[in-house]
From Swiss-Prot:
It is found in: Cytoplasm. This is Vesicular-fusion protein SEC18. The modification Phosphoserine is found at S226. Keywords: ATP-binding, Cytoplasm, ER-Golgi transport, Nucleotide-binding, Phosphoprotein, Protein transport, Repeat, Transport. It comes from the Eukaryota. GO terms for cellular component: cytosol; Golgi apparatus; Golgi stack; mating projection tip. Belongs to the AAA ATPase family. InterPro entries: AAA+_ATPase, AAA_lid_3, Asp_de-COase-like_dom_sf, ATPase_AAA_core, ATPase_AAA_CS, Cdc48_dom2, CDC48_domain_2-like_sf, CDC4_N-term_subdom. One of its GO terms (molecular function) is SNARE binding.
Length: 758
């Protein structure tokens, strides 16, 4: 609420008509015309001295209130109204009406004065319209001079003379207040039942009326806009959207703050309002929900919501026409009312599906380009509109035509990211509100614990988790047997969602931007074997790089190259480091997933994975077998230069300011990468050698629970004679051990297999 200048003073500074000891009996009167123009311009009811006292309030048909003025030209039993008054009441001449004295203070209590009044103004005769610009402050002074102390209600019609011109006025809305209050406590009302007395302190706002012909000069006062875009009773917590406090603050600052300021201030600043707001981010983070909720917090026209593909049509020119139709209402109102017109909101969902970069389509029709051109023309063309707000939503901001992202178009771009722990707690609080209010949630459920356990869950996934937990609780009351399914009615009364239900739901619902746990665990299927001090050293180095990415302010991106012979355990070590990191987002890019894809599909897959890695605060990417990803083969040799160049760029591209990324890349062809000139893309290198001494083999046999001590000693002794230059990878060693385990003579079988491998 805004403070209204002049209020907060004693109510004694205004004396209303004395209504004490007034005869309140109802009288039946006939409607007649007012005696002359002075009565018509004064907005009074002409009455006979025999019917009512002079200068009191009367109410007609228990709804319409006027101030009386005596006239000897009005016979007893009649009441004189001008044409505007008769239009407001819906009366015809000689019609019977009921009239009685009216005490506003008994009707409304202390809130009987007008804090503000909004008035539509039109020329009484269109043929006498002039292009003169009328000062709103002077109009307001004239209105007070003519009608001070009269009672006004929304929908009321009256006629006013100003500078020799006659105007029809219609009361749009009023705000009733108590003169003793510092600030208004009631909302702006548009219903006729709200009534108030006009005073010198009343804030009066004029707007172009139905003809749109009256040119109004912006008021020089610093009073706020009467048609403020933000509802006065709006609170952010009422939106029911959690985890987006910073985003809502930015949206309000950039898109709405200017719209609640007085037009005179905005005019002095020489700025225009923001017309476009782009919400982008991962799926399920609440972009569409925010757009819908923004419509509820605004005093605006009902938003027009359009899914991107709905714009397109098979008929020539229809797609462009669909765009024009979305702006038609806003254009018509802006022509009629100018800066005083209401805000029109247009919401585009899946913006990237239609407004792609011009020239990128291969259909040859040019329809997509024309649709982009049409939207650009409407948002920021020659005939600019200042009463629109276009809200676009997309998961792929990079696909949208760059011209749409410049100032004047979608200039406010807000990333709706995955919620942090505080945001997830807010979302859990919202999603379980009814559950808690109805005592359907067990006391052992700790929402803070659940928020900590649900790293990288989007708002939609948290909602799914709550539903899954509820299904586990419901399932306890249902007996599903061979016969009919039975519901235990006794258990329904005791139904509660417990901590165990939520923990079970965590296994049921996994985040889209979480850990590729299944793929990574496949890489270390047999567990991590610490057969050598070198393995311990590699894991410690990896943990150090993890800490660097997590804690250092200067290392948003760290790239590691893990190289060594094939089968030396590079992928397993990278997977182990990733799994032990505790990072919420871990992805594996493996040749297995890209097998069978075309070159362009591989590039798109790798690019999308890197982009996904920028959507979480802490991220790890494991790129397995880099030389295979670029399709390198020694015969020729040949490789995909497009994939190679894409990887070179991606490996060096730093994530956004508040995101961290650790990239671990494995290769068995170090010399090949050297020739490809990609080694400079990595910050550090970790060498993973084969097993080169028999003590390491002995440790592997012990951890694999293979043979007894005597058998292992025999294997080592045999290999020391047959393989003086022992050099075998851990992967091959484990395979040989499993093969020998199923032989009748495992000792000799393993010795033979290891000799062949060495």
């Amino acid at each position: 609420m805004f403070k209204i200048p002049g209020f907060g003073k004693a109510a004694a500074n205004h004396t209303p008509p004395d209504m004490t000891n007034m005869d309140t009996r109802t009288r039946h009167l006939k409607v007649s015309n007012c005696p002359n123009n002075s009565y018509a311009l004064a907005n009074v009811a002409a009455v006979s001295p025999n019917d009512f006292p002079n200068n009191i309030y009367i109410i007609i048909d228990n709804l319409f209130v006027f101030t009386t003025r005596h006239s000897n030209d009005i016979p007893p039993g009649t009441i004189g109204f001008n044409g505007n008054q008769r239009t407001w009441g819906g009366w015809s001449l000689n019609q019977d009406v009921q009239a009685k004295a009216f005490d506003l203070f008994k009707y409304s209590g202390k809130q009987s004065y007008l804090g503000s009044i909004d008035i539509d103004i039109s020329f009484r005769a269109r043929g006498k319209a002039v292009s003169t610009v009328f000062d709103q402050d002077e109009l307001a002074k004239q209105f007070v001079r003519c009608y001070e102390s009269q009672i006004f209600s929304p929908t009321q019609y009256l006629i006013m003379e100003f500078q020799g011109h006659f105007f029809d006025l219609k009361i749009r809305n009023v705000q009733a207040i108590d003169l003793g209050d510092i600030e208004p406590t009631s909302a702006v009302a548009t219903g006729i039942e709200t009534k108030g007395i006009l005073t010198k302190q009343t804030q009066i706002n004029f707007f172009k009326g139905r003809d749109g012909l009256v040119n109004l000069k912006s008021s020089n006062s610093l009073r706020p806009r009467s048609n403020a875009v933000i509802r006065p009773d709006f609170k952010f917590e009422d939106l029911g959207v959690g985890g987006l406090d910073k985003e809502f603050t930015k949206i309000f600052r950039r898109a709405f703050a200017s719209r609640i300021f007085p037009p005179s201030v905005i005019e002095k600043l020489g700025i225009s309002h923001v017309k476009g707001l782009l919400l982008y981010g991962p799926p399920g983070t609440g972009k569409t929900l925010i757009a819908r909720k923004i419509g509820t917090m605004l005093n605006a026209k009902e938003p027009k919501i359009v899914n991107g593909p709905e714009i397109l049509s098979k008929y020539v020119g229809s797609s462009e026409e669909n765009i024009r139709n979305l702006f038609k209402d806003a254009e018509a109102e802006y022509r009629a009312k100018g800066e005083e017109s209401s805000l029109h909101i247009i919401i585009f969902d899946e913006l990237d599906s239609v407004f792609k970069q011009r020239g990128s389509r291969g259909d040859g029709t040019g329809v997509g380009d024309n649709v982009v051109n049409q939207l650009l023309a409407k948002m920021d063309g020659v005939d600019q509109l200042n009463n629109i707000l276009v809200i676009g939503m997309t998961n792929r901001k990079d696909l949208i035509d760059s011209a749409l992202l410049r100032p004047g178009r979608f200039e406010v771009q807000v990333e709706i990211h995955l919620p942090d722990e505080k945001g997830r707690l807010q979302i859990f609080d919202i999603q379980t509100k009814k559950m808690r209010e109805n005592n359907m949630m067990s006391d052992d459920v700790n929402l803070a614990e659940l928020a900590a356990l649900t790293k990288n869950f989007s708002g939609a996934e948290i909602e799914g988790l709550v539903k899954s937990a509820s299904s586990f609780a419901i399932n306890k009351t249902v007996n599903i047997g061979k016969g009919a399914t039975k519901l235990n009615t006794k258990d329904i009364a005791k139904l509660k969602v417990t901590r165990e239900d939520f923990l079970n739901a965590l296994n049921d619902v996994t985040p889209a931007f979480g850990i590729s746990e299944e793929d990574l665990k496949t890489c270390v299927e047999g567990g991590m074997m610490l057969y050598s001090e070198r393995v311990n050293s590699i894991l410690k180095n990896g943990a150090r790089y993890v800490r660097q990415v997590r804690e250092s302010d200067k290392s948003r991106l760290v790239s590691l190259l893990i190289h060594g012979p094939a089968g030396s355990g590079k992928t397993a070590l990278a997977a182990e480091i990733a799994l032990k990191s505790g990072f919420p987002f871990i992805r594996l890019i493996s040749p297995n997933e890209l097998s069978g894809m075309s070159e362009s599909a591989k590039i798109a897959y790798i690019d999308n994975t890197f982009r996904d890695a920028y959507k979480s605060p802490l991220n790890i990417l494991v790129i397995d077998s880099l030389e295979t990803l670029v399709d390198w083969v020694p015969i020729g040799p040949r490789f995909s230069n497009n994939i190679l160049q894409m990887l070179k760029v991606a490996l060096k591209r730093k994530p956004p300011q508040d995101r961290r990324l650790l990239i671990m890349t494995t290769t068995s062809a170090y010399s090949v990468l050297q020739q490809m000139d990609i080694l400079s893309c990595f910050d550090n290198e970790i060498a993973v050698p084969n097993m080169t001494n028999l003590d390491e083999l002995n440790n592997v046999m012990i951890e694999s629970n293979f043979l007894d001590d005597a058998g292992r000693v025999k294997v080592i002794n045999e290999l020391s004679r047959s393989c003086p230059n022992f050099n075998v990878g851990i992967k091959k060693t484990l395979t040989n051990i499993e093969t020998a385990r199923h032989d009748e003579d495992p000792v000799n079988e393993l010795v033979e297999l290891m000799t062949q491998s060495a």
